[in-house]
Amino acid sequence: MILPKRTQEKEISLLMHYLDEVFPLQFPFHERRYVGKREWLLTILASTRPVYYATLSLSLLHKEACLHEFEAELAEIWQKEKMRYYILALQESQQQLDALDTAYGIAKMKGNIHALASTLQLISFESSSLSKGDWQLHLRAGTSLIPVLIDGWAVALKSDKVASSSSLWTELDASDFNATHDEDSLSYEYVGALKFFANVLAMFGIFSCISIGPSSPFMEYRFLMDQAGLIQMDQIMGCRNWAMLAILEIGTLDKWKREEQENRRLSLKALTSRAMAIEGVLESGLREASGSALVDLITSIYATSALTYLHTVVSGLNPNLSEVQESVAATIVLLKRLPDLRAAKSLVWPLGVTGCMASRSQEDFFRGLIISAGATPRALRNCWGLMKVWEDTWKMREYMSKQPPERWEEVVSGQGPPMLLM
């Protein structure tokens, strides 16, 4: 993109701010030892206008969050620029999607990766505690790309671009540096981007299930998760696939249960059988994830929180149930083992589920954890927003023990727009 020099300087500065400050906040558990590290990232961010503008708006959102109260004049300027870039990102995204209708081959694959990248940046923007916007619209757009992303991954698997080394640079040959070389396959950078963004889409999608309930496209996310070698959540969010799959299965069980209830044909035998199968997977995984590595600890936190989710789907959102109390207590034990409590800021989903089902004696632990984690009201992630969700839920505790609310989405979002627990 050719821009006036002064504009270009400011935008490059914002891009670097994103790389240095925002990306690590979005993905603090991103494992850099694996293929591609972040060597593909700048290529994708600067590749097309939608991705570029969405990233700049996200960078300004973070800068705005870091301002002090006495910097109101500067905040107003940044807010205007933030919204300008955001609107540009929306406009360019629509044009990009329209252009995909006439694209084909490698150009279409790259276009789909660009579309996914810009969509996920817009979800991060809209779902932030600073925006509280319509992230569902963008998530639906991202989900619609799943079939073509899987096709792209199948093509990549047939090429030599899915490297086994720790850096894509060890696999390059002279043709990769030849400017006149016609591309007949995705480059290493684009394969790395495809894999990364597909994992992020799966993560957002699975987390959204508890926020929006049965309207979630469970089968599409399951289809994505089942792609061999593509989804490796531990590399992105520190949690292994089996725990995230279990969360997805619990959401699917919740949908099935509601449909059966609506049709007055719910079989408690079938419900128990399905729930026990999921519980067995979680308990088996927890036994295997008993190591000292951080990925084992993070995975276990998600798994014990998933047990709480499962018990509430089966028996209702009642914090007085013994099985709920056991899984909540188990999660608290694991949270106390975090080597750095600041990591808790990135565990919004397990904190949301576990905290809502906490007992009165456990309330102060969760309040203190948010403070110790360094969460603030003005942050990209929704960790601070959990405080209101918890407090509102705790006020209803006595009512919940007598007549539990039937839907998690009512607890998570209250009367406001759905909250993405990430």
UniProtKB/Swiss-Prot annotation:
Keyword annotations from UniProtKB, A to Z: Nucleus, Transcription, Transcription regulation
InterPro entries assigned: Fun_TF
Entry's Gene Ontology cellular component terms: nucleus
Entry's Gene Ontology molecular function annotations: DNA-binding transcription factor activity; transcription cis-regulatory region binding
This protein's record includes keyword Cell wall biogenesis/degradation: no
Superkingdom classification of source: Eukaryota
Keyword flag Lipid metabolism: no
Cellular localization per UniProt: Nucleus
Xref: Pfam families: Fungal_trans_2
GO biological process: positive regulation of transcription by RNA polymerase II
Its job: Transcriptional activator of all of the trichothecene biosynthesis genes. Acts upstream of the cluster-encoded transcription factor TRI6 and is necessary for full expression of both the other trichothecene genes and the genes for the primary metabolic pathway that precedes the trichothecene biosynthetic pathway.
Family (UniProt): Belongs to the TRI10 transcription regulator family.
Protein name: Trichothecene biosynthesis transcription regulator TRI10
